[in-house]
Amino acid sequence: MQILVHCIQKKDDDFDNIKEYIKMSSKWADIKDINKFNSQIAKAQSASKEQAHKAYDLAYEHCLNGYCIGLDEKGYHLDSVEFADLLKNSSQISFFIGGAYGLSPQFKTKMNRLISLSKMTLAHKIAKLMLFEQIFRGLCINANHPYHK
């Protein structure tokens, strides 16, 4: 199984725990943390929400592989067992985290599923940490590992 996590993010300054969750998950899945950011995105984010969405869409257009899940504040709320079931859907799963303006309405229509990690707005670093922890937890649930009790 391959799990790709795509994020519009300036730097690779994530919490060290993300690397740990990727390492611990490696016995069940090949997980990649893919950050996208370039001068076009930076310029577009300064211009307008619409320009930013176009830049995000362009950065992500070649990343739509496997079962695609977008993170969105209005997405479906799952508990950990339901999230684990999502991980059973495909041999390749791609998660998408939008930039400062979220995912564009057009890009959201290309997703197989939209989920929300919280009703609250989260910083990218925190959202990513929560996502990687839930991926690890979901893989543990599916493997009957005692991490999830």
Curated annotation (Swiss-Prot):
> Which SUPFAM superfamilies does the entry link to?
alpha/beta knot
Write the Enzyme Commission number(s) for this entry.
2.1.1.177
> What domain of life is recorded for the organism?
Bacteria
- Which parts of the chain span the membrane according to its record? none
Location within or outside the cell: Cytoplasm
What's in the GO CC field? cytoplasm
Where is this protein primarily located?
A: cytoplasm
Alphabetically sorted, this entry's keywords are: Cytoplasm, Methyltransferase, rRNA processing, S-adenosyl-L-methionine, Transferase
Q: Which reaction does it catalyse?
A: pseudouridine(1915) in 23S rRNA + S-adenosyl-L-methionine = N(3)-methylpseudouridine(1915) in 23S rRNA + S-adenosyl-L-homocysteine + H(+)
Molecular function via GO = rRNA (pseudouridine-N3-)-methyltransferase activity
Q: Which Gene3D superfamilies match?
A: 3.40.1280.10
What broad class of enzyme is this?
transferase
Specify which residues bind S-adenosyl-L-methionine according to the UniProt entry for this protein: 71, 98, 117-122
Q: Does the keyword rRNA-binding apply?
A: no
Oligomeric form and interacting partners = Homodimer.
Its function, per the record, reads: Specifically methylates the pseudouridine at position 1915 (m3Psi1915) in 23S rRNA.
Family (UniProt): Belongs to the RNA methyltransferase RlmH family.
The entry's protein name is Ribosomal RNA large subunit methyltransferase H
Please tell me the species this chain comes from: Campylobacter fetus subsp. fetus (strain 82-40)
Q: Which gene encodes it?
A: rlmH
